[in-house]
Amino acid sequence: QWCGSRGKTENCIVTVHLAYATPDFHCLLDGDLFLPKGWSADRPRCRAAGIPDEVEYRPKWKIALELYDQARANGVCFRWITFDEGYGGKPEFLRALTARQQWFVGEVPTSFTGGGSRGTIFARTRSATARASAASWRRAPVAGSRC
């Protein structure tokens, strides 16, 4: 499967992790293995690798959401969460976080199309950022508490 740290398809294990960080503290809270769709469809291969029959393919964003929900059920409060474009490019993930009233800052692919709450399409990120002047960029404060 694709191994991001190696930059190529490789024999590797891919995991999804949930981490918690403050200026003074950081730790991994939870993690789960990602089983590629090709593996999930090949049950004899899974059995040979010791993967139980009940383990099925789940997209990484769904695994991340399950880890998040479990942490929240255990009383962990996240003021903000961040993620890379592998998750930010999945509208289902963004909608699920919004439905949970979770604040987030995420990377999105340059081909991502942004939209408004009423379904209005703004622009693809690539074209929107190309049109923006250097003076239009600013740091946005993210202070406040959701917990």
Spans of model-derived segments:
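Active-site-proximal, Lys/Arg-enriched surface segment
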Residues: 1-35
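A short local loop/turn or secondary-structure capping micro-motif enriched for an aromatic residue
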Residues: 36-40
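An internal, acidic/charged active-site-proximal segment
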Residues: 41-147
